[in-house]
Amino acid sequence: MGFERAFVESSPEQENKLFVGVSYMDSSNKNQDPSESNNQISFGGQHQHHQQQFFYNHHQQQQLQNNNQVSFGMMQQSSSAIPGSLISKDSAGAYDLGELDQALFQYLDGQEPSSIQEQRQNSGMRPPTLNIFPSQPMHVEPSTTNKMNTGLVSPAISGSKRSSQPSMELSNNLKNNDAPSASGPEPPKAAKREGNRKGPTSSSEQDAPKTPDPKTLRRLAQNREAARKSRLRKKAYVQQLESSRIRLTQLEQELQRARAQGYYFGGNSLLGGEQNLPVNLANMSSDAAVFDMEYARWLEEHHRLMCELRNAVQEHFPENELRIYVDNCVTHYDEIMNLKSMLTKSDVFHLVSGMWKTPAERCFMWMGGFRPSELLKIILSQIEPLTEQQLMGICGLQQSTQEAEDALSQGLEALNHSLSDTIASDALSCPQNMANYMGQMALAMNKLSTLEGFVRQADNLRHQTIHRLHQLLTTRQAARCFLAIAEYFHRLRALSSLWHARPRQE
């Protein structure tokens, strides 16, 4: 059996005491209850109950013993502190402390010496030595089997515990310093294992997809939306190119049909001699050809919009739905005005000549388009009944439009007279003076450039008239108004077709 021994030095008033796995009370505490004293008895295993009973029965005998007691703790110090009369024998030598322990606990347990010897052999107990350097860390508790074999766990009083704790800490420090090879490499191994444990975790965290922040998600959504809009614009552009190609093919076919019908100048004409070019191709610019193609597309789209509007009016659509069709018509008129504005800058004579119109429409043209005042007279009877306020507004619009038309007409007439006078200012003889001729042509071109301004003002007047009607009329009245305008120009185009298809008299 293993024991834990401690050597305690007493104060001058007390003698040295002997503790064999237990602490005894002083003689001054004779009348006290042993259960309430600070001395505690701790025995391991199955012998604890017998040991407590023994010490209780022999309490009186222990008080009569000599006060000089030897502590089982440190072997060398205890031998110097024990009186010779107590444990010294004859010259043969001192009592062995292990034999004293064996005899004492043999008496306590009532066991045979042979059983004690077998128990010591089975437990592999080493000779009792000073256990300053424990073979195991202090915080590791021994197993229950070792406790059963050893039998006792030495108790100590509070004073001895306080005195033994610094010595235990010192022994632990000495153990750590003396045997670095035993405990030193273990923390690095543990750290290495921990690092190995953390390694896959960190790599897995790096491999795991990171959730982007809201700003990145918003940017990704914006990029996707921009890409989607770009694809839609590209698709619309491709469709527009395809439709333009189809329109160009149709225009070429119309030119071929016109050439087949005999729209040529004579062989000695001023526009190409014997080249036999059609009139509409002799002096047509590229901008004029594009405008004719876009105008043909605009006519088809206008016809579709008018069919939808007529269907909505006939089926008595609600006011809000009907307003959508009316707004589409106004927007469509704005589109043709923009096309004419671009052509005015590049080829104003193409607009004024009316080559993009049918012959019947050309008869009623005024400065590259219809007269707004005449249009108001036509539709006034088609949008009745009108309120008094609406009637006054339309009459005022008609009057202001008529005044603007008269002013533009007078300006255009003055331009024509001035241009004619400039050209005929010099003698109209064939061998003319080249210096005077070039001066007259430069002056005439300068005056002719004002024609662009007249055409632009006329288009603005037509545009304002359309929008003013849209504002004065209700939604249903505006729908009937646009249907009447579309039907009017459709009949003019039909008249031209009928005129070309009429039977020829010989």
UniProtKB/Swiss-Prot annotation:
Bias kind Polar residues: ranges: 25-45, 113-124, 142-152, 160-180
Name by which UniProt lists this protein: bZIP transcription factor TGA10
Keyword annotations of the record: Activator, DNA-binding, Nucleus, Transcription, Transcription regulation
Family indicated by similarity: Belongs to the bZIP family.
Free-text function comment from the UniProt entry: Transcription activator that binds to as1-like elements (5'-TGACGTAAgggaTGACGCA-3') in promoters of target genes. Regulates transcription in response to plant signaling molecules salicylic acid (SA), methyl jasmonate (MJ) and auxin (2,4D) only in leaves. Prevents lateral branching and may repress defense signaling.
Gene Ontology molecular function terms on file: DNA-binding transcription factor activity; sequence-specific DNA binding
Stretches with biased composition (Basic and acidic residues): 207-216
Region feature Disordered, mapped onto this chain: 22-50, 113-218
Gene Ontology biological-process annotations: DNA-templated transcription; positive regulation of DNA-templated transcription; response to auxin; response to jasmonic acid; response to salicylic acid
One Pfam family cited in the UniProt record for this chain: DOG1
Location of the bZIP domain: 213-257
Taxonomic source organism: Nicotiana tabacum (Common tobacco)
Signal peptide (residue range): none
InterPro entries to which the protein is assigned, alphabetical: bZIP, bZIP_sf, TGA_domain
Tissue expr: Specifically expressed in roots.
Compartment(s) where it occurs, according to its Swiss-Prot or TrEMBL record: Nucleus
Gene expressing this chain: TGA10
Domain DOG1 as annotated: residue spans: 288-502
GO cellular component: nucleus
Sequence segments annotated as region (Leucine-zipper): 241-255
Chain segments carrying region Basic motif: 215-235
Key word Magnesium present: no
Residue span of motif Nuclear localization signal: 217-224
Oligomeric form and interacting partners: Binds DNA as a dimer. Interacts with TGA2.2.
Lineage: Eukaryota, Viridiplantae, Streptophyta, Embryophyta, Tracheophyta
